[in-house]
Regions:
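Rossmann-like dinucleotide-binding domain for NAD(H)/NADP(H)
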Residues: 129-130, 266-357
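Compositionally biased low-complexity segments enriched in histidine and/or tyrosine
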Residues: 1-9
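Phosphate-binding beta-alpha-beta segment of Rossmann-like dinucleotide-binding domains, i.e.
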Residues: 127, 133-184, 196-199, 204, ...
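Short glycine-/small-residue-rich Rossmann-like dinucleotide-binding loops
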Residues: 89, 112, 240, 246-248, ...
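A short helix->loop->beta-strand "cap" motif at the edges of active sites that frequently abuts
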Residues: 100-105, 125-127, 206-207, 266-268, ...
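A short, aliphatic-rich alpha-helical micro-motif
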Residues: 75-79, 97, 101, 180, ...
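An N-terminal-biased, well-structured beta-alpha scaffold segment characteristic
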Residues: 25-130, 257
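Rossmann-like dinucleotide/phosphate-binding beta-alpha-beta segment
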Residues: 33-36, 173-266
C-alpha cells in the first residue's frame, strides 16, 4: 500500500483527470461555463475529502446525507446521475439502476466485495463496475492476525475473568491456549489477503500452510510460503488454525457448517475476515458451545450489525470485531481515491483502475 495515491495519479491523471479538467477548460470558455458534464451520486456523507475533491473537478456531486445510509434517499437522488460512487453495503440492484436512468454509465464500489451488487444487471446494461481490492489486503491481514492471537490465547475470556474478579492462576492449567508455533495453518481462499496473512505468519515459526481454492496459485507463491493445495476435507481435518479469506459466492455460502466443524480438530482456531454468510452461525455457536472446536475470531457476521442479544455474544471462546478489517485512515482514504478514479475513468470510457470484470 506504499504510495498508493501516487501510483493512482501516475496511471490516471493523463486520462481521467486530464479529461475532466480539459472539459472544464472548454466549458469555461463558452457561454455555458457553469454547466458540468457528469453527475455522480455519492452514497455516503463521510467519503474522504481526497476522493470528493478529485471527482468534483468537472463533475457535479450529488451527496447523500443520511447516516446510516438510507435506501429511500439513494433512490430519490439517483435520478439523472451518470456515475455512482457506491460507499454503502446496501444492495445496488435493478431498482437503483432504473431510478438513475438510461444515462448511467459508470459504477464503482468502495469495497473489495461486490456480493451486494447485481453484477449481471450491470453487465446487461454494459455499465462498467469497479471495486477496491488489493489496497485493503494489509489492513485486513493485520486484523486477521489480531483475531488469531486473541482467539488462540483467549484474550476475550481473559478480560471477562478480570472484570468478574475470577483470577484462578493458582491452577497450573488455568487459561491454557493454543500456540502458533509449529501449527499447520489452513486458508480457505488464498488470494491477496490470504497471502498477506501468510507473509505475517513468517515470524511465528509455523509448520506449513495448506490452502483450498478453485485454482492452484502460482508455484512461486507455494514455494515462498511453503504452501500446498489440498481438498476441502483435508483442509478441515489438518488445520490447527484456519483462515476464511474467500469471496462470498453461491458455492461458498454456508460451507462452514455442522458437517465441516465435525471434521475439524478439537484444538482448531477458526478466523473469518471474508464474509459472514460463509459460516452457518447457528452451527458455529453449537461447535463453540460444545467445544467441538477450540475457539474462533470473526470480523464479519450475518446480519450486520449483529443484534446485541445475539447468542454468539454469550460465548467466551469467540472473539468478535464489528467488520473493521479495512478501518484505518490510510486504507479507507486509498479505497475512496481508487473508487473515485474508477468512476471517473468509466465516465470517459477509459479502463478502470480496479475493474470487477
Amino acid at each position: 500500500c506504499v504510495c498508493v495515491c501516487e501510483t493512482i495519479y501516475t496511471r490516471s491523471r493523463s486520462t481521467t483527470t486530464t479529461t475532466t479538467e480539459s472539459t472544464m477548460e472548454s466549458k469555461e470558455s463558452s457561454e455555458s461555463s457553469e454547466e458540468v458534464t457528469f453527475k455522480i451520486l455519492v452514497t455516503h456523507p463521510e467519503v474522504p475529502k481526497e476522493a470528493l475533491d478529485l471527482m468534483s473537478r468537472g463533475c457535479q456531486l450529488v451527496m447523500c446525507d443520511s447516516l446510516p445510509p438510507n435506501r429511500t434517499e439513494i433512490l430519490q437522488k439517483a435520478k439523472g446521475v451518470h456515475g455512482m460512487f457506491w460507499a454503502v453495503g446496501l444492495p445496488l440492484d435493478k431498482e437503483v439502476m432504473d431510478a438513475a436512468g438510461s444515462q448511467l454509465k459508470s459504477v464503482s464500489a468502495m469495497s473489495a466485495g461486490i456480493d451486494h451488487i447485481d453484477v449481471a444487471e450491470l453487465k446487461k446494461r454494459k455499465i462498467p463496475l469497479g471495486h477496491t481490492p488489493t489496497v485493503l489486503n494489509y489492513a485486513v491481514a493485520d486484523i486477521a492476525m489480531g483475531l488469531m492471537l486473541s482467539a488462540a490465547r483467549r484474550f476475550h475470556e481473559g478480560r471477562n475473568k478480570i472484570d468478574s474478579s475470577s483470577w484462578e492462576n493458582y491452577h497450573i492449567e488455568w487459561m491454557w491456549g493454543q500456540e502458533i508455533r509449529d501449527a499447520t495453518v489452513g486458508f480457505f481462499g488464498f488470494g491477496g489477503i490470504g497471502q498477506a496473512i501468510a507473509q505475517r505468519l513468517k515470524g511465528f515459526d509455523i509448520e506449513k500452510i495448506l490452502y483450498t481454492t478453485r485454482k492452484r496459485v502460482d508455484k512461486s507463491v507455494e514455494k515462498e510460503f511453503n504452501a500446498a493445495k489440498v481438498p476441502f476435507d483435508d483442509l478441515l481435518s489438518q488445520s490447527d488454525i484456519l483462515f476464511i479469506a474467500a469471496p462470498l459466492t453461491p458455492e461458498t455460502q454456508g460451507v462452514f457448517n455442522s458437517t465441516s466443524f465435525a471434521k475439524m480438530k478439537k484444538n482448531a482456531v477458526l478466523i473469518n475476515i471474508a464474509r459472514g454468510p460463509i459460516i452457518n452461525q447457528d452451527d458455529l455457536y453449537t461447535a463453540l458451545k460444545t467445544n467441538q472446536i477450540f475457539s474462533a475470531g470473526i470480523d464479519v457476521m450475518s446480519p450486520e450489525p449483529l443484534p446485541a442479544d445475539d447468542k454468539l455474544l454469550s460465548l467466551p471462546n469467540l472473539v468478535i470485531t464489528p467488520h473493521i478489517g479495512s478501518a484505518t485512515q490510510r486504507t479507507r482514504t486509498d479505497m475512496a481515491v481508487i473508487c473515485a478514479h474508477n468512476v471517473l475513468r468509466g465516465l470517459v470510457g477509459e479502463p478502470m483502475l480496479s475493474p470487477a470484470y
